[in-house]
Amino acid sequence: MAKTALITGASSGLGAEYARQLAARGAHLVLVARDRAALDDHAARLRRTYGIEVEVLVADLLKPRQLAKVVARVADPERPVEMLVNNAGFGLPLAFERNDIEDEVEHLRLHVEVPMRLTHAALGAMLGRGHGRIVNIASVAAFIPRSTYGACKGWLVGFSRWANGRYAPSGVTVTAVCPGYTHTSFHERIGLPPGQEGVPDALWLNARDVVSESLRDVSRGRPVSIPSLRYKALVALARFAPPALASRLGERGR
């Protein structure tokens, strides 16, 4: 088990669940998010419940100086991070042509540039120690045409596959986790209340199962983790589906 895990987007959703499950396994934590109150509350509960050390690092990862602070923490040789979970992200509410282009650029930076910078910092430290794990939270949208969101997640999957092949022999594994629709506050933040996402009930997953299954794949050093059999089947179908059908699949929900 990782001695210390750093998790971005750790105040809610999958990030908060990764923190809970890693704490239950004995990992100390560095929690990164913008909301200090939510981070402090979550950290206090984790310390109280699991008796672990929790460091809170408040940062807006789209602000260069604040991102640099997190990069420095990841690379700090005196306080080694054994697992990096690149989880921070957000969705956009409209079709590409209707979104503000500056919102699209920030979306691209948070989903691609930020994990690339943090991964680069982590690799320098982890390779020097000869061990470490990097977890990039992608999505099944990586395998289905899905505007810029799917394109960003596709980059994460391709990058993680390559990085795992290159660095796993040196003791550092890189895994892209590709959940399907998961019950978190993600959709509400883009204006889709529960029940209005346009997604059949059978396709919804819960965060606890997504994180548990993905951590099992991470521990095995797999380059890609697709939690749940139903989404493994959906991804397999998408690989062989005609382009028109794959595009229609990508129009469901967010």
What residue spans do the PLM features occupy?
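Active-site helix of classical SDR
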Residues: 119, 152-155
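Conserved glycine-rich Rossmann-like NAD(P)H-binding loop of the short-chain dehydrogenase/reductase
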Residues: 25-42
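Conserved glycine-rich cofactor-binding loop
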Residues: 11-12
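C-terminal helical subdomain
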Residues: 176, 197-234
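Substrate-binding pocket helix/loop in short-chain dehydrogenase/reductase
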Residues: 95-97, 103-108
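Conserved NAD(P)H cofactor-binding loop of Rossmann-fold oxidoreductase domains
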Residues: 87-92
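Residue(s) in the substrate-gating loop at a strand-loop-helix junction
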Residues: 139
